[in-house]
Amino acid sequence: MSDAIKHECGIAMIRLRKPLEYYIGKYGTSLYGINKLQLLMEKQHNRGQDGAGMACVKFDMPPGTRYINRLRSNAASPIKDLFNNINQQFENISRQNPKRIMDVQWMKYHAEFTGELFLGHLRYGTFGKNDIRNLHPVMRVNNWKTKNLVLAGNFNLTNVDELFEKLVAYGQYPIETSDTVTILEKIGHFLDDENEALYARFKGEGYQKSEITDHIIEHLDLLAILENSSKYWDGGFAIAGMLGHGDAFVMRDPAGIRPAFYYEDEEVVVAASERPVIQTTFNLKTEDVKEIEPGHALIIKKSG
């Protein structure tokens, strides 16, 4: 059985499956994704007494522009503080030029958290100081979009020391021994391997360097990366992640210790730690929301 809900962190993920213009036409807002993420997080506020954070990936941004945004808060009311800061930006834009808030291209280039993929986390600290550096999402940054990794989770691994030693055996030199850093670097290691193998393959096939990234995006085997990364993990976990180019995942431990649920339709793919949270946010029936089976992963490709 899992721990009581009050002793667990919470996750929330939203992937928009339509162009942002679609949500303006149907719902009258360019902020549909982040508004829904806020609801998902507020409805899990019991899981986030010690901190909250969220990140967003913008699709198809040109080189030289920021395509991942992240904000975290360890304030007394972290969810409120988090979204007050984010929404203040949108209020300022609306006040200065109301038309811009409905201009998708302008918003993507000039406003943060205006993308297609969102990940939120609520921290209930079981150990470790309530330092903002301990808050999720955590990031592994790289100039290659397909090597960027954003991670958030609800987990408690029991063999962190063993996993840390495996990282050292790979030749890495981690600066922390926490399970968060260990998981981030473990997935990152196999993500790097997959990227490098695909790069060598497509370079050998004669593709130009500038073309190879698109082929890596198309052929990246996220399932294999997760299988290799989690092979020796022992304990409970529900982990959500985003890659810089737009792939995303939610994976769950084989024993089903940590919960995770999802819903999908033609507009969105949504995941969260609690079924009723998804139901009430999207006005769904109980049977509409599916459980991510123990030992399985929900994988969302950038292609949809």
Which residues are covered by each model-predicted region?
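Conserved short alpha-helical segments that host acidic/polar catalytic motifs at enzyme active sites
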Residues: 1-304
